[in-house]
Regions:
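A domain-level signal for the structural core that forms small-molecule/cofactor-binding pockets
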Residues: 2-244
Length: 244
């Protein structure tokens, strides 16, 4: 449904308030011509109190899924509150990166004019594949080549940004690219390198059920693309940190 059609249907806040939270949020997204794919952050279009409403809505829909799976949640004490647990898990934890703003990150000027390679990692990350909503669990290494105009952020902030980006359904290739965009915009380094290695439970748990395979991908920008020696140094130090 187009933005114009929606605006024609819903003319007042009072009318909107009678809709489920998901429909109100979707209305705002479409009205602002914003995409809302599985790995998009939509927090700017969520108002106070709506996440609680959204959890209740998801729980209700999840109860319907359990019913369709012919699970007797009334007499089975193990599944009495499964729908509510799953809703809370999705909204507050594993898909949290969709629904909350990016964590606050304090940036500091590079007064010391640092221009040597910095590596952060391995950072443990958890995500979910958007195809089957199965877990993705892995590690991320970040290489930064700052310049005198770069911003510096605390080590823990790299982990917080990683968690925010990863906490949503997506494919690994897009997740690493999204993380690179956030760090490039924040730190503004001469070079940025990111490597992610992860287990995909959509492959371990179902389908071919191969529990040995991992997926590794990388993003190299700026100095890491231009300078093969810098790239080798990063990968060698990363491998050394992996063994320790």
């Amino acid at each position: 449904m187009s933005s114009a059609t929606l605006k024609g249907l819903f003319r007042s806040e009072e009318e909107l308030s009678r809709l489920p939270a998901s429909e109100r949020i979707r209305y705002r997204l479409i009205g602002a011509d914003c995409r809302y794919h599985a790995n998009d952050n939509i927090s700017a279009h969520i108002r106070d109190g709506e996440l609680e409403e959204l959890k209740a809505e998801v729980a209700q829909q999840m109860q319907g899924v359990l019913k369709s799976l012919v699970i007797d949640t009334e007499s089975d004490h193990n599944t009495n509150e499964t729908a509510q647990r799953v809703a809370k898990m999705f909204v507050e934890e594993v898909f949290r990166g969709r629904y909350v703003p990016m964590p606050s990150v304090t940036e500091f000027p590079n007064f010391s004019r640092l221009n040597e390679l910095m590596i952060v990692g391995p950072i443990k990350v958890r995500s979910a594949c958007s195809h089957h909503l199965c877990p993705i669990i892995g590690r991320v290494w970040i290489g930064i080549m700052p310049n005198e105009f770069s911003n510096l952020i605390g080590l823990s902030k790299y982990a917080r940004i990683c968690d925010w980006v990863m906490s949503r359904p997506q494919i690994q290739e897009e997740a690493v690219t999204m993380l690179a965009e956030e760090l490039q915009n924040r730190v503004k380094p001469d070079g940025l390198a990111i490597v992610m290695e992860a287990d995909h439970f959509c492959m371990h748990w179902r389908g071919v059920k191969d529990d040995e395979s991992v997926m590794t991908n990388s993003v190299m920008r700026g100095a890491f693309l231009r300078d093969a020696n810098l790239r080798r140094e990063f990968l060698a130090l990363m491998a050394n940190k992996s063994r320790n």
